[in-house]
């Protein structure tokens, strides 16, 4: 069995708060204590969206617990249970950004020969990975302390990722393949997105082609939308 994984260059993740409970045992005190001690602390779990409680946005679980006069364990349990009961698999009622990793581990995983460099997020996920992942890896994770050469980095972003998920003629530049191409200045490529402003455009990206159509020209969007749904082992 071939094993692979997707990795992005940040110490914080983003998802529904319910993802902290894989067994969905939200009222298990021991489980909640374990989460706060070993996965993410109450100070490191911040709501970036909440349809039921808009006033929770940009507050941590610790902040909300303090305002409610409850323990952090009680509050995490309550917030997660409420979110699960009132949300659905296709429509979460909230999203959090939570620190749960360290840079040395992130570098180790990025450098693993079988890992894909991916963003794992879109532009509206309130996490800088959506706009900053690839420029950040290019600018900060090259060399002996990172992933090595620029060529290896690009390979892990493109051909390796496409191969691992079964996409035909993607991630390569050759006759007959789909023309998904990025023209960038490696010396001046830099991510600008942050946790407080996650949609800032990166620097150093000149032009982008998707399926042979130019969608970014001299750093400006062309208005073209040639993207398509990609399916495993399909044209």
Language model features: what each stretch is:
Residues 54-55, 162, 197-200:
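Short loop/turn motifs at secondary-structure junctions and domain boundaries
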Residues 1-123:
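Polyanionic/metal-chelating signatures
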Residues 28, 107-114, 119-120, 133, ...:
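C-terminal cap of metal-dependent C-N hydrolases
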Residues 14-23, 128, 194-195, 219-221, ...:
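Short acidic, glycine/serine/threonine-rich loops at helix termini
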Residues 228-235:
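Long, low-complexity intrinsically disordered regions
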Residues 124-129, 140-145, 197-200:
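Short, contiguous acidic/charged loop-to-helix segments that flank catalytic cores in large enzymes
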Residues 60-67, 71-107, 137-189:
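C-terminal helical cap
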Residues 55, 128-132:
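Alpha-helix N-cap/helix-start motif at coil-to-helix transitions, marked by capping-box chemistry
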């Amino acid at each position: 069995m071939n094993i692979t994984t997707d990795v992005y260059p940040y110490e914080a993740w983003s998802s529904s708060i319910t993802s902290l409970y894989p067994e969905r045992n939200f009222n298990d005190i021991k489980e909640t204590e374990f989460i706060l001690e070993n996965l993410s602390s109450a100070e490191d779990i911040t709501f970036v969206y909440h349809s039921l409680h808009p006033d929770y946005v940009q507050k941590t679980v610790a902040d909300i617990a303090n305002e409610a006069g409850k323990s952090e364990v009680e509050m995490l349990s309550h917030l997660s249970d409420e979110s699960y009961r009132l949300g659905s698999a296709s429509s979460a009622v909230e999203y959090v950004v939570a620190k749960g990793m360290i840079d040395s581990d992130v570098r180790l995983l990025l450098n693993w020969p079988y890992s894909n460099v991916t963003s794992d997020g879109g532009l509206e996920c309130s996490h800088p990975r959506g706009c900053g992942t690839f420029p950040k890896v290019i600018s900060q994770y090259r060399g002996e302390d990172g992933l090595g050469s620029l060529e290896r980095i690009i390979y892990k972003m493109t051909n390796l990722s496409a191969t691992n998920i079964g996409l035909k003629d993607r991630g390569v530049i050759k006759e007959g393949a789909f023309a998904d191409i990025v023209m960038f200045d490696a010396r001046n490529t830099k991510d600008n997105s942050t946790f407080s402003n996650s949609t800032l455009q990166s620097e150093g990206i000149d032009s982008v082609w998707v399926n042979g159509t130019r969608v970014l020209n001299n750093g400006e969007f062309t208005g073209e939308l040639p993207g398509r749904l990609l399916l495993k082992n399909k044209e």
